[in-house]
């Protein structure tokens, strides 16, 4: 959530920045609402002052034994008007708050202005994509998995529906090995604290990280008496651990990681990536979250991104780093790097991680602050998050990049010990 005072003091600048994100901010309407709010507040304060004055007068008259019935009538009249105005003020404030909640984060100054993924900027590449012989082109991961009888989309469709999968045998083991490898790397080498978090969250948590109110259609909600939703990403439960907290500055930065399933309805994705494992309703991810101070926010993004990159480097998977443009960033992001892994069957790079610096945008929603003895008052923390990595997409990248002409899959060296010594899947 943007700072309301900053928005009011910089209306034109805010409107221009929001426009680069595809959000049309109606300045005239917002100013009219603000003027009305100020008028109602002033009227409320005026009536409260009148009531206080009359109350003192009542006390004085009672002390003298004088009749106060006419004054009580005035008080009742003021109270009735206050009820009406206070409700009107509350409704108007709710409308203003909903407008603020609907605004995406303002982009950092170095974020390229653009409309969509075509305007993203490549920062760097790592690794060299493998060349396949023209007579033996790269197979798609889903075809390889089905030939090996270790990926079964038909069984998943029978059990549940489309955009689900059943993994079997050594590919299921490889999927498990990947999550263990990622967690070990981040906890043992990068200094993260491992967490086990709920897979169901309440609405306050979803508001805190920015999924609500705008992205309700992307959530799977429980029916019945519980107002819970399945997590779309572990970013939600992890980041909300600091909601309504005042942290000791000395304890920052905090680095958290967790391996969880994620659930997304993929609303708006009809017809995209219908084949294979790229876009699933249920998938697993190792999430990275940083909680830090404002002066360390941007450098923390570089660090978090490097941690996600290290997974790809250890697995020897070619990738590139993209700086997202204003029109392609996530709602809560101030600046984002996407990691895109090479998929030989598609002859292109595809997203495997999105690493974002959210500034104080989420912290303001969550009332997440920090303080030390030298500070006059608590300050908002800065939050960052990224995938380190999406397990399913890493799995399919390994299947495609490590496929052999005989239909087998070589296991990356870094994973052999997690596979119990298995070096080939066939």
Curated annotation (Swiss-Prot):
EC assignment: 6.1.1.11
UniProt: ATP binding residues: 264-266, 351-354
Pathway: Aminoacyl-tRNA biosynthesis; selenocysteinyl-tRNA(Sec) biosynthesis; L-seryl-tRNA(Sec) from L-serine and tRNA(Sec): step 1/1
Compartment(s) of residence: Cytoplasm
Primary enzyme class: ligase
Example of a GO biological process term: seryl-tRNA aminoacylation
Protein name: Serine--tRNA ligase
Organism of provenance: Francisella tularensis subsp. holarctica (strain LVS)
Upper lineage: Bacteria, Pseudomonadati, Pseudomonadota, Gammaproteobacteria, Thiotrichales
């Amino acid at each position: 959530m943007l700072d309301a005072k900053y928005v009011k003091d910089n209306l034109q600048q805010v409107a221009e920045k929001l426009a680069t994100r595809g959000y049309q901010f109606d300045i005239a309407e917002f100013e009219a609402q603000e003027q009305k709010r100020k008028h109602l507040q002033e009227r409320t304060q005026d009536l409260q002052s009148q009531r206080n004055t009359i109350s003192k007068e009542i006390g004085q008259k009672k002390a003298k034994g004088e009749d106060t019935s006419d004054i009580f009538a005035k008080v009742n009249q003021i109270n009735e008007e206050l009820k009406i105005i206070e409700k009107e003020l509350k409704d108007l404030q709710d409308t203003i708050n909903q407008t603020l909640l609907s605004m995406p984060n303002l982009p950092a100054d170095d974020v390229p202005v653009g409309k969509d993924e075509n305007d993203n900027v490549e920062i760097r590449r790592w690794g060299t994509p493998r060349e396949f012989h023209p007579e033996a082109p790269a197979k798609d991961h889903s075809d390889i998995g089905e030939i090996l009888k270790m990926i079964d989309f038909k069984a998943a469709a029978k059990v549940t529906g489309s955009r689900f999968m059943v993994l079997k045998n050594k590919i299921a083991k490889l999927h498990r090995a990947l999550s263990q490898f990622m967690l070990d790397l981040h906890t043992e080498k990068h200094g993260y604290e491992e967490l086990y978090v709920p897979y169901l969250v309440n609405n306050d948590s979803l508001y805190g990280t920015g999924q609500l109110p705008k992205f309700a259609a992307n959530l799977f909600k429980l029916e019945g008496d519980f107002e819970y939703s399945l997590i779309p990403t572990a970013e939600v439960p992890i980041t909300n651990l600091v909601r309504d907290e005042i942290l000791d500055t000395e304890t920052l930065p905090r680095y958290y990681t967790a391996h969880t399933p994620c659930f997304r309805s993929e609303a708006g994705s009809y017809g995209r990536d219908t084949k294979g494992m790229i876009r699933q309703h249920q998938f697993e991810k190792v999430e990275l979250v940083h909680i830090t101070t404002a002066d360390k926010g941007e450098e923390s993004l570089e660090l978090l991104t490097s941690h996600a990159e290290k997974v790809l480097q250890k697995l020897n998977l070619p990738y590139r780093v993209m700086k997202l443009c204003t029109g392609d960033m996530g709602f809560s992001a101030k600046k984002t790097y996407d990691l895109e892994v090479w998929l030989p069957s598609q002859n292109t790079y595809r997203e495997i991680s999105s690493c974002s610096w959210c500034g104080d945008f989420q912290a303001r929603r969550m009332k997440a602050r920090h303080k030390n003895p030298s500070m006059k008052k608590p300050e908002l923390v800065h939050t960052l998050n990224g995938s380190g990595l999406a397990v399913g997409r890493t799995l399919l990248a390994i299947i495609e990049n490590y496929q052999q002409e005989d239909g087998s899959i070589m296991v990356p060296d870094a994973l052999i010990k997690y596979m119990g010594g298995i070096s080939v899947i066939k």
